[in-house]
C-alpha cells in the first residue's frame, strides 16, 4: 500500500510540473501570436518602397508606444514571424517607414517585460505576470493536493 501511495504522489508531482511548464510556454507563444496578428496588415508593405498606410502604421504605433514587450516577444519567436514572411529586420524597417521611433536594444534586456527594462507606458496591460501567477497557483494547489494525499 505504501508503494502505491508513493507512486501516486510522484505521478501527481510530474503531471503538475508539466502543466506548469506548459502554461508558461504557451503563455509566451500566445502573446507572440497576438503581436504577430497585429503585424498582418503590414505584410504587403514588407518589400515595397512606398510608405505603409495607416491600416498598418496605427497598430504598429500602438505596439511601439504602449506594448513594447509584445514586439520583443514576437522577436523571440522567429518562426512565428516567418509565418508572415517577416524578419526582425523587416519589422524594424516597417517601424521606420511608419515614422515610429523604436529602440531595438530594449528587447536585449534580460527581462523585457520587467518595468525597469521598459518605458512606463509599455508595462500597462502586460499579461506576463498574470500568466506566471496562474502557473504558480496551479503549482500551489497541486502540491496542496499531493500533501493532502500523503496525509490520508
From Swiss-Prot:
PANTHER family: BIFUNCTIONAL INHIBITOR/LIPID-TRANSFER PROTEIN/SEED STORAGE 2S ALBUMIN SUPERFAMILY PROTEIN-RELATED. Residues 1-23 form the signal peptide. GO terms for cellular component: plasma membrane; side of membrane. Glycans are attached at residue 108. It is a lipid-anchor; GPI-anchor. SMART domains: AAI. Keywords: Cell membrane, Disulfide bond, Glycoprotein, GPI-anchor, Lipoprotein, Membrane, Signal. The keyword ATP-binding does not apply. Disulfide bonds join 42-56, 57-98, 70-107. This is Non-specific lipid transfer protein GPI-anchored 8. Probable lipid transfer protein. It comes from the Eukaryota. InterPro entries: Bifun_inhib/LTP/seed_sf, Bifunc_inhib/LTP/seed_store, LTSS. Belongs to the plant LTP family. A lipid is attached at residue 124 (GPI-anchor amidated serine). It is found in: Cell membrane.
